[in-house]
A protein has these predicted regions:
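Short alpha-helical segments enriched in small residues
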Residues: 1-179
Length: 179
Protein backbone atom coordinates (compact mmCIF):
# COMPACT_ATOMS: atom_id res chain seq x y z
CA UNK A 1 0.00 0.00 0.00
CA UNK A 2 2.96 2.32 0.44
CA UNK A 3 2.27 5.88 1.44
CA UNK A 4 -1.49 5.34 1.10
CA UNK A 5 -1.41 3.08 4.17
CA UNK A 6 -2.54 4.97 7.26
CA UNK A 7 -2.79 2.45 10.11
CA UNK A 8 -4.20 -0.87 11.26
CA UNK A 9 -7.50 -0.91 13.10
CA UNK A 10 -9.57 2.02 14.23
CA UNK A 11 -7.58 5.24 14.09
CA UNK A 12 -8.01 8.77 12.85
CA UNK A 13 -5.73 10.76 10.58
CA UNK A 14 -5.24 13.23 13.41
CA UNK A 15 -4.04 10.38 15.65
CA UNK A 16 -1.60 9.25 12.97
CA UNK A 17 -0.23 12.79 12.53
CA UNK A 18 0.03 13.11 16.31
CA UNK A 19 2.06 9.88 16.53
CA UNK A 20 4.36 11.06 13.72
CA UNK A 21 4.91 14.38 15.50
CA UNK A 22 5.65 12.61 18.80
CA UNK A 23 8.13 10.30 17.08
CA UNK A 24 9.98 13.39 15.84
CA UNK A 25 9.53 15.23 19.15
CA UNK A 26 7.92 18.10 17.22
CA UNK A 27 4.92 20.35 17.80
CA UNK A 28 2.08 21.70 15.67
CA UNK A 29 -0.08 24.82 15.58
CA UNK A 30 -2.98 25.39 13.20
CA UNK A 31 -4.78 28.33 11.62
CA UNK A 32 -8.25 27.92 10.18
CA UNK A 33 -10.57 30.13 8.24
CA UNK A 34 -13.35 28.32 6.39
CA UNK A 35 -13.18 25.17 8.56
CA UNK A 36 -13.91 27.17 11.70
CA UNK A 37 -12.06 24.96 14.18
CA UNK A 38 -12.66 21.50 12.74
CA UNK A 39 -8.94 20.88 12.25
CA UNK A 40 -8.16 21.76 15.85
CA UNK A 41 -11.13 19.68 16.97
CA UNK A 42 -9.69 16.64 15.18
CA UNK A 43 -6.50 16.92 17.24
CA UNK A 44 -8.28 17.53 20.54
CA UNK A 45 -10.13 14.24 20.00
CA UNK A 46 -6.79 12.41 20.29
CA UNK A 47 -5.96 11.50 23.92
CA UNK A 48 -2.74 13.16 25.04
CA UNK A 49 -2.54 15.35 21.93
CA UNK A 50 -1.38 18.35 23.95
CA UNK A 51 2.09 16.78 23.92
CA UNK A 52 2.34 17.74 20.24
CA UNK A 53 -0.68 19.91 19.38
CA UNK A 54 -0.17 23.36 20.89
CA UNK A 55 -3.36 25.03 19.67
CA UNK A 56 -4.76 27.10 16.89
CA UNK A 57 -6.34 30.28 15.67
CA UNK A 58 -9.74 30.50 14.02
CA UNK A 59 -9.23 33.49 11.77
CA UNK A 60 -12.43 33.87 9.79
CA UNK A 61 -11.96 37.61 9.28
CA UNK A 62 -9.02 39.29 7.60
CA UNK A 63 -8.52 41.51 10.64
CA UNK A 64 -7.85 38.42 12.77
CA UNK A 65 -5.46 37.01 10.15
CA UNK A 66 -3.49 40.25 10.37
CA UNK A 67 -3.67 40.81 14.14
CA UNK A 68 -3.12 37.28 15.43
CA UNK A 69 -1.14 35.59 12.66
CA UNK A 70 0.81 38.50 11.21
CA UNK A 71 -0.54 38.04 7.69
CA UNK A 72 0.45 41.26 5.91
CA UNK A 73 -2.38 43.56 4.79
CA UNK A 74 -0.54 43.94 1.48
CA UNK A 75 -0.66 40.17 0.90
CA UNK A 76 -4.41 40.12 1.50
CA UNK A 77 -4.92 43.10 -0.81
CA UNK A 78 -2.80 41.59 -3.59
CA UNK A 79 -3.77 37.90 -3.37
CA UNK A 80 -6.90 37.75 -1.20
CA UNK A 81 -7.70 35.64 1.84
CA UNK A 82 -8.43 32.60 -0.32
CA UNK A 83 -5.02 32.11 -1.91
CA UNK A 84 -1.94 29.95 -1.67
CA UNK A 85 0.01 32.95 -0.42
CA UNK A 86 -2.43 33.55 2.42
CA UNK A 87 -2.49 29.86 3.36
CA UNK A 88 1.29 29.81 3.66
CA UNK A 89 1.32 33.04 5.68
CA UNK A 90 -1.34 31.60 8.00
CA UNK A 91 0.61 28.37 8.53
CA UNK A 92 3.83 30.28 9.16
CA UNK A 93 2.07 32.74 11.45
CA UNK A 94 0.51 29.98 13.53
CA UNK A 95 3.85 28.20 13.93
CA UNK A 96 5.71 31.39 14.81
CA UNK A 97 3.09 32.87 17.13
CA UNK A 98 2.59 29.61 19.04
CA UNK A 99 6.29 28.60 18.92
CA UNK A 100 5.54 25.34 17.10
CA UNK A 101 7.78 23.37 14.75
CA UNK A 102 4.98 22.90 12.22
CA UNK A 103 2.08 25.06 11.13
CA UNK A 104 -0.93 23.83 9.18
CA UNK A 105 -3.62 26.12 7.79
CA UNK A 106 -6.83 25.96 5.80
CA UNK A 107 -8.50 28.79 3.90
CA UNK A 108 -11.07 28.57 1.14
CA UNK A 109 -14.59 28.96 -0.16
CA UNK A 110 -16.76 26.26 1.42
CA UNK A 111 -19.95 27.71 -0.09
CA UNK A 112 -22.72 28.27 -0.77
CA UNK A 113 -21.56 31.86 -1.39
CA UNK A 114 -18.23 33.33 -2.41
CA UNK A 115 -15.84 32.14 -5.03
CA UNK A 116 -14.52 33.77 -8.17
CA UNK A 117 -13.04 32.71 -11.51
CA UNK A 118 -9.63 31.93 -9.95
CA UNK A 119 -11.04 30.30 -6.83
CA UNK A 120 -14.50 28.86 -7.49
CA UNK A 121 -16.72 27.52 -4.72
CA UNK A 122 -15.12 24.48 -3.13
CA UNK A 123 -11.56 25.78 -3.57
CA UNK A 124 -9.41 25.06 -0.52
CA UNK A 125 -5.81 26.16 0.04
CA UNK A 126 -3.85 24.19 2.65
CA UNK A 127 -0.71 25.85 3.99
CA UNK A 128 2.14 23.86 5.50
CA UNK A 129 5.07 25.30 7.44
CA UNK A 130 7.85 22.93 8.52
CA UNK A 131 11.44 23.08 9.74
CA UNK A 132 12.61 22.59 6.14
CA UNK A 133 10.26 24.85 4.17
CA UNK A 134 6.75 25.97 3.33
CA UNK A 135 4.27 24.64 0.78
CA UNK A 136 0.68 25.00 -0.29
CA UNK A 137 -1.68 22.43 -1.70
CA UNK A 138 -4.85 23.49 -3.49
CA UNK A 139 -7.86 21.19 -3.76
CA UNK A 140 -11.37 21.67 -5.11
CA UNK A 141 -14.46 19.90 -3.83
CA UNK A 142 -18.10 19.85 -4.77
CA UNK A 143 -20.94 19.35 -2.36
CA UNK A 144 -22.49 21.19 0.52
CA UNK A 145 -20.68 23.46 2.93
CA UNK A 146 -20.28 20.85 5.68
CA UNK A 147 -18.98 18.26 3.21
CA UNK A 148 -16.42 20.68 1.79
CA UNK A 149 -15.24 21.61 5.29
CA UNK A 150 -14.89 17.97 6.37
CA UNK A 151 -13.05 17.03 3.19
CA UNK A 152 -10.72 20.02 3.61
CA UNK A 153 -9.73 18.85 7.10
CA UNK A 154 -9.21 15.30 5.83
CA UNK A 155 -7.04 16.59 2.97
CA UNK A 156 -4.95 18.75 5.33
CA UNK A 157 -4.35 15.88 7.75
CA UNK A 158 -3.52 13.40 5.02
CA UNK A 159 -1.15 15.82 3.30
CA UNK A 160 0.64 16.57 6.57
CA UNK A 161 0.94 12.84 7.28
CA UNK A 162 2.54 12.30 3.89
CA UNK A 163 4.88 15.31 4.23
CA UNK A 164 6.10 14.19 7.67
CA UNK A 165 6.70 10.63 6.49
CA UNK A 166 8.64 11.93 3.51
CA UNK A 167 10.69 14.16 5.83
CA UNK A 168 11.41 11.21 8.15
CA UNK A 169 12.46 9.05 5.20
CA UNK A 170 14.78 11.76 3.85
CA UNK A 171 16.28 12.22 7.32
CA UNK A 172 16.85 8.45 7.47
CA UNK A 173 18.57 8.50 4.09
CA UNK A 174 20.77 11.42 5.15
CA UNK A 175 21.64 9.70 8.41
CA UNK A 176 22.36 6.38 6.66
CA UNK A 177 24.58 8.11 4.10
CA UNK A 178 26.77 9.55 6.84
CA UNK A 179 27.10 6.26 8.73
Amino acid sequence: LGEDFVCFGDCSLAAVVYRELRALDRTLAVAESCTGGLLGDAFTNVPGASKAFLGGVICYSNDVKVALLGVPDSLLEQHGAVSAECAIAMATGSAERLSADYGLSITGFAGPEGGNKDNPLGTIHIGYHSPVGVWCKTVRYTGGRLDVKARAVHAALDWMRRKIRKYKFEEFLNYSATD
